[in-house]
């Protein structure tokens, strides 16, 4: 028997041991990643179940009227979620309307128009805005923005639209400074860095050959941005907007400072109002009685459902866009 034949069993044994070791490592890796994925679903389900269980007393007591009633009276234990829902939706919608054009515009400037020496400082300034705690925004809004709006902007707007049908009610009432519009402006400032950063990052993924080809046939910067950059990155932009909207819907401290915390619905954007998160933050520690606490938990469940529905609608919209464009 040759030396090679004598060494074959040892080689096979070493190879089999290596294969078994790799197989064990691979199995552990698969099990760990699978457990992590399942944990996410378990946590999500646990949050939903705990919110539903905690809100059951309020939901069973008030029924569907909990969603349609504006009343919120802890003394008589009559609770309705319509006013907080209204405030949450209106402030978030206005914030998105303000922040999306600004964020996309800043991203276009940074990627297409900004001189190279200024790109890094401006980009760092945008990222710094994202790192400021929300309570700082709230304090700034209460002591700086709200007084400025009260003494300067709101009286001017009220006088401009006074007597104009349809718009006079939208900007009616005394200039409190705080209210729906102030909260929406604070939210817009807070979510602006998210939209800008994500949009800038997805703009950077556009292949240079596409933009250079468009410039080569005589397209302007506006045409390149509109016809090449934005269509190529639409899904990433939508993702950034949805992330910002989720931040706006759930924001608590900054909104609590400047919204006025009034459980009422007004057509005026200058009127004090409240949101779901602000109501929970203001009243949870003062909730006396099981029904009061259950009503606050029910508000949390409603916010959970609203956020889930918005993300589901966004996903559906992206699927429709992909199907229509063949992406």
From Swiss-Prot:
Membrane-topology descriptor: Multi-pass membrane protein
ABC transmembrane type-1 domain ranges (all copies): 85-314
GO molecular function terms attached to this record: phosphate transmembrane transporter activity
Transmembrane segments: 36-56, 89-109, 128-148, 178-198, 235-255, 294-314
The UniProt record lists the keyword Cell inner membrane: yes
GO CC terms, sorted: plasma membrane
Pfam families reported for this sequence: BPD_transp_1
Annotated keywords: Cell inner membrane, Cell membrane, Membrane, Phosphate transport, Transmembrane, Transmembrane helix, Transport
Compartments where located: Cell inner membrane
Keyword Cell inner membrane: yes
GO biological process: phosphate ion transport
Annotated family: Belongs to the binding-protein-dependent transport system permease family. CysTW subfamily.
Protein task: Part of a binding-protein-dependent transport system for phosphate; probably responsible for the translocation of the substrate across the membrane.
Listed name of the protein: Phosphate transport system permease protein PstC
Organism: Mesorhizobium japonicum (strain LMG 29417 / CECT 9101 / MAFF 303099)
């Amino acid at each position: 028997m040759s030396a090679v034949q004598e060494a074959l069993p040892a080689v096979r044994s070493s190879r089999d041991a290596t294969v078994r070791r790799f197989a064990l490592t691979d199995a552990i890796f698969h099990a760990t990643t699978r457990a992590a994925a399942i944990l996410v679903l378990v946590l999500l389900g646990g949050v939903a179940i705990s919110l539903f269980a905690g809100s059951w007393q309020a939901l069973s007591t008030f029924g569907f009227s909990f969603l349609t009633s504006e009343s919120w009276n802890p003394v008589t234990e009559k609770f309705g979620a319509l006013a907080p829902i209204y405030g949450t939706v209106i402030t978030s919608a206005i914030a998105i309307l303000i922040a999306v054009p600004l964020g996309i515009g800043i991203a276009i400037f940074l990627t297409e128009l900004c001189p190279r020496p200024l790109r890094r400082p401006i980009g760092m300034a945008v990222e710094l805005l994202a790192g400021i705690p929300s309570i700082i925004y709230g304090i700034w809004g209460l002591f700086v923005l709200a007084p400025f709006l009260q003494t300067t902007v709101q009286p001017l707007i009220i006088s401009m639209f006074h007597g104009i049908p349809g718009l006079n009610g939208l900007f009616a009432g005394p200039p409190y400074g705080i209210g729906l519009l102030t909260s929406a402006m604070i939210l817009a400032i807070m979510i602006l860095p998210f939209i800008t950063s994500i949009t800038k990052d997805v703009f950077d993924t556009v292949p240079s050959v596409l933009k250079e080809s468009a410039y080569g046939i005589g397209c302007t910067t506006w045409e390149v941005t509109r016809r090449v950059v934005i269509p190529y990155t639409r899904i990433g932009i939508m993702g950034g907007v949805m992330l910002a909207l989720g931040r706006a819907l759930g924001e608590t401290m900054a909104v609590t400072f400047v919204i006025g915390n009034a459980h009422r619905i007004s057509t005026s954007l200058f009127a004090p109002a409240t949101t779901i998160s602000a109501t929970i933050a203001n009243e949870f520690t003062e909730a006396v009685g099981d029904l009061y606490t259950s009503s606050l938990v029910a508000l949390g469940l409603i916010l959970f459902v609203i956020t889930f529905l918005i993300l589901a609608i966004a996903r559906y919209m992206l699927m429709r866009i992909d199907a229509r464009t063949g992406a």
